[in-house]
């Protein structure tokens, strides 16, 4: 379907204005994982019983995609990476445009996909399923995520967004359990509803602008006419609601906790990080052209964005406080953190866009570390991550500091507490665009959410630092306690090491991350 949409669009554009310029190297962030998925299936046909080649091919494809996005992220001229362009068209009439923020998001989501792949590789002995299919689905989702971030035409944008989502549904249900099937069905129904809303929003957008492109020229023309402006605002609000399902914003969040709990933990990590970064990129593609077009005072778009952000922050934080299961805590934390990611976008400024991307990357790094720890804790003889209760983590920082320490750092980052300076800076940067835009009520509510969030994460940190409980072994014949094991596989070790190092370095010198984004 993606290929047909792209071919039809390119054919129509070519007929109107001549040849389309295509630079395959600039498409590498999406092209590398897409080709990698095909190569994995080919390798599986030649060596069906080997798993290491699948992992190597998948990792190399994701690394190549991230390398392909580096020039755009580090461009000193801050010029977007353009391809699939028509000569002489408005705004270059490019279907692919990846500015520095877009390229940074592509690197982040490809890195998060690689982390999820490494975590999943540790569980291949315990989980049923075809390993080649697992890798191919993760690569397909990564290709869709990288494409939607840079897509500047609604047809491509919509198909790429679904490509980033649908493979994850299969990854959830491939576990083969009734619980996984329920989580996958919940995610699929949510995805279908989201797609329907997005299609309606797309139709309204074309009705308002007369164009399927996400170009500033078409938006400025529609904004100048009051009637078209009203339809355009309705279109962007409808599209925002559709993306609200992808971002787990309240009240579109109901699928998140059951899906996180029912699927394999590495896939939950993929949903919480890479999928969210792709949705943020899709949202930025819609909102970015509105910077500077809105009236100086808050209007409907800013109000809706701010209301959904604050609602997500407060609801997610309050419910997370009651969580006694680490995965449920991370699920409700994802809802709360999604509100923080969207909050600076209410300012409708480029500064707000940078703040949103910075917060999304900060959350993704901390979330991956937390999920890596969750995969390492299990009941004796159980599946990875099978022991998720609060009691199982009591004293983990003392008994297993190499696992408990990174989890404490991740929770401090999410709470915005020192010594995790990165989390504190991320929250300050997220609030600052609101103050500059005069949205003081939103800023005050955000501060309240910070205070509530501290209580959530400090509760878990206190458990991690407490004295470990004495647990009996099965050989003792005493059933007074459950034996909890900590087994860190090679993939989890890599994610823990790199993720913790990133959080430490970014907390010591946070200006490095925020300097790159500015």
Regions found by a protein language model. Name each.
Residues 2-518:
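Alpha-helical transmembrane segments of multi-pass membrane proteins predominantly involved
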């Amino acid at each position: 379907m993606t290929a047909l949409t792209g071919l039809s669009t390119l054919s129509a554009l070519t007929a109107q204005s001549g040849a389309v310029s295509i630079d395959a190297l600039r498409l590498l962030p999406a092209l590398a994982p897409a080709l990698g998925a095909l190569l994995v299936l080919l390798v599986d046909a030649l060596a069906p019983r080997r798993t290491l080649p699948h992992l190597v091919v998948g990792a190399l494809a994701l690394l190549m995609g991230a390398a392909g996005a580096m020039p755009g992220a580090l461009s000193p001229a801050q010029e977007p990476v353009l391809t699939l362009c028509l000569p002489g068209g408005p705004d270059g009439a490019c279907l692919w445009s990846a500015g520095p923020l877009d390229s940074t998001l592509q690197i982040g989501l490809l890195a998060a996909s690689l982390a999820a792949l490494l975590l999943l590789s540790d569980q291949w002995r315990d989980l049923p399923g075809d390993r080649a299919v697992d890798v191919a689905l993760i690569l397909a989702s990564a290709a869709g995520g990288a494409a939607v971030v840079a897509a500047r035409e609604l047809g491509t944008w919509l198909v790429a967004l679904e490509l980033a989502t649908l493979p994850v549904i299969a990854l959830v249900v491939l576990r083969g359990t009734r619980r996984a099937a329920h989580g996958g069905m919940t995610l699929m129904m949510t995805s279908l509803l989201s797609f329907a809303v997005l299609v309606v929003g797309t139709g309204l957008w074309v009705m308002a602008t007369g164009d399927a492109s996400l170009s500033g020229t078409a938006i400025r023309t529609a904004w100048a006419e009051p009637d078209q402006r009203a339809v355009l605002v309705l279109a962007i609000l409808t599209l925002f609601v559709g993306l609200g399902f992808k971002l787990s914003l309240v009240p579109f969040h109901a699928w998140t906790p059951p899906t996180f709990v029912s699927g394999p933990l590495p896939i939950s990590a993929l949903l919480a990080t890479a999928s969210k970064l792709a949705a943020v990129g899709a949202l930025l593609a819609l909102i970015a052209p509105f910077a500077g077009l809105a009236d100086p005072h808050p209007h409907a778009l800013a109000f809706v964005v701010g209301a959904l952000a604050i609602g997500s922050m407060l609801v997610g934080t309050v419910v997370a406080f009651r969580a006694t299961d680490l995965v449920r805590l991370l699920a409700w934390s994802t809802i709360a953190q999604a509100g923080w990611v969207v909050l600076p976008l209410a300012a409708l400024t480029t500064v707000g866009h940078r703040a949103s991307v910075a917060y999304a990357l900060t959350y993704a790094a901390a979330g991956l570390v937390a999920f890596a720890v969750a995969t390492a804790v299990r009941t004796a003889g159980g599946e990875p991550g099978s022991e998720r209760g609060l009691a199982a983590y009591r004293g983990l920082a003392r008994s297993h500091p190499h696992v408990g320490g990174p989890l404490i750092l991740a929770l401090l980052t999410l709470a915005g507490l020192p010594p995790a300076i990165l989390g504190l800076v991320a929250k300050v940067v997220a609030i600052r665009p609101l103050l500059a835009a005069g949205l003081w009520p939103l800023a005050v509510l955000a501060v309240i959410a910070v205070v509530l969030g501290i209580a959530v994460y400090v509760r878990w940190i206190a458990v991690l630092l407490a004295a470990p409980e004495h647990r009996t072994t099965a050989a003792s014949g005493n059933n007074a306690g459950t034996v909890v094991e900590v087994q860190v596989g090679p993939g989890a070790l890599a994610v823990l090491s790199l993720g913790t190092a990133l959080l430490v370095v970014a907390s010591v010198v946070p200006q490095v991350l925020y300097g790159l984004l500015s």
